[in-house]
């Protein structure tokens, strides 16, 4: 009886490993130069069970400036009730304000990139996600740090860390006037 139980346990363990490897995924690649279009396309994909995978901004293979987003979906268990917001601006003050408004509504950070705007600036673009299920959204406090000096950024990151903020990402943005800034995004979630 013990040998039979051990053999059955090994067989179940082996078959569960096979199930993991046989999972299938579907993908949607979204590409556009307009943030409003990207947000609409991401939410349309979310309605079909896709979730955010990754983002990149830059020059496409045909020479245009675009933001590329990969949306992913498990064929067996598609996601449901996700909503996305895409923020993009070359003004850090505006970005901080919009980011905090989204945090107040429970939107969580997914990713960020930089892409060139029609006005010659390099806009920081941030993608946020919120689960639309019945659970109340938790408030998230965001902090945006921006400086042209890396030594200043390190000092500000340490101060934010001491205040309980978790680092999420960093990019170098360029304003329409030609200035470059190191921009870090951090968050603190209310308990």
Protein language model annotation of sequence segments:
Residues 18-191:
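Terminus-proximal functional modules
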Residues 1-7:
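Bacterial N-terminal signal peptides that target proteins for export
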Residues 7-16:
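Bacterial N-terminal signal peptides
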């Amino acid at each position: 009886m013990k040998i039979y139980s051990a053999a059955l346990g090994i067989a179940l363990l082996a078959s569960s490993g096979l199930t993991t490897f046989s999972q299938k995924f579907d993908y949607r690649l979204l590409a556009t130069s307009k943030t409003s279009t990207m947000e609409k396309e991401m939410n349309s994909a979310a309605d079909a069970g896709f979730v955010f995978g990754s983002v990149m901004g830059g020059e496409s293979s045909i020479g245009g400036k675009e933001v590329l987003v990969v949306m992913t979906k498990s064929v067996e268990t598609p996601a449901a009730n996700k909503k996305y917001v895409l923020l993009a601006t070359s003004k850090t003050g505006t970005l901080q304000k919009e980011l905090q408004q989204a945090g107040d509504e429970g939107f969580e950070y997914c990713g960020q990139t930089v892409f060139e705007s029609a006005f010659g600036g390099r806009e920081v673009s941030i993608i946020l996600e919120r689960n639309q299920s019945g659970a109340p959204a938790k408030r998230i406090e965001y902090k945006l740090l921006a400086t042209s000096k890396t030594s200043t950024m390190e000092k500000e990151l340490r101060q934010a860390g001491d205040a309980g903020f978790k680092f999420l990402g960093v990019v170098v943005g360029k304003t329409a006037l030609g200035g470059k800034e190191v921009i870090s995004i951090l968050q603190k979630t209310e308990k």
